[in-house]
């Protein structure tokens, strides 16, 4: 049975997808079999956009599991939080369906890197947040952060939330995306 590692971030657009793809590639280079999974994807149709990015970084084609929908059991067209996207499409997100997909992947691969949607506290369904899901499944976490304004606060709050809930944080990955405002970097006293 493979090891499942959950990858989440301090916010949306913090670079979780890039970090997930890079970590998957690193594990592959170490000789491990690895698959990435997207818990829920909003803002696209059919194959989850984030999986396409993962596969490009990994240097592989879409997998059989991608084409079967196992690596992203829920895809919604409207770009918003998962619970709202599901509501707009009159669908219900069930944790058991995601868990079943993850378990099937873990039977085949050494590592399953399960990427969340948005930040830790985003509701993935009407009843629960991503943090609830991580805690319920006792997944270890890689937290992705960045250098954007407010990230120190968001990172510390996220780590505190994990500590309070007994979630094991394997590492904090700093992602250089988005890039710093060049004016602030070159002339920090200009503002």
From Swiss-Prot:
Taxonomically, the superkingdom here is Bacteria
Indicate yes or no for the key word Iron: no
Q: Which organism is it from?
A: Haemophilus influenzae (strain ATCC 51907 / DSM 11121 / KW20 / Rd)
Chief localisation class: cytoplasm
**What does UniProt list as this organism's lineage?**
Bacteria, Pseudomonadati, Pseudomonadota, Gammaproteobacteria, Pasteurellales
Concerning HAMAP family, the annotation shows: BioD
Catalysed reaction, written as an equation: (7R,8S)-7,8-diammoniononanoate + CO2 + ATP = (4R,5S)-dethiobiotin + ADP + phosphate + 3 H(+)
EC id: 6.3.3.3
Q: Which GO terms describe its cellular component?
A: cytosol
Protein name (record): ATP-dependent dethiobiotin synthetase BioD 2
Residues annotated to bind substrate: 42
Q: Keywords assigned by UniProt?
A: ATP-binding, Biotin biosynthesis, Cytoplasm, Ligase, Magnesium, Metal-binding, Nucleotide-binding
The pathway entry for this protein reads as: Cofactor biosynthesis; biotin biosynthesis; biotin from 7,8-diaminononanoate: step 1/2
Compartments, record wording: Cytoplasm
Q: How does it assemble?
A: Homodimer.
Binding of ATP: at which residues? 13-18, 50, 115-118
Please list the residues that bind Mg(2+).
Answer: 17, 50, 115
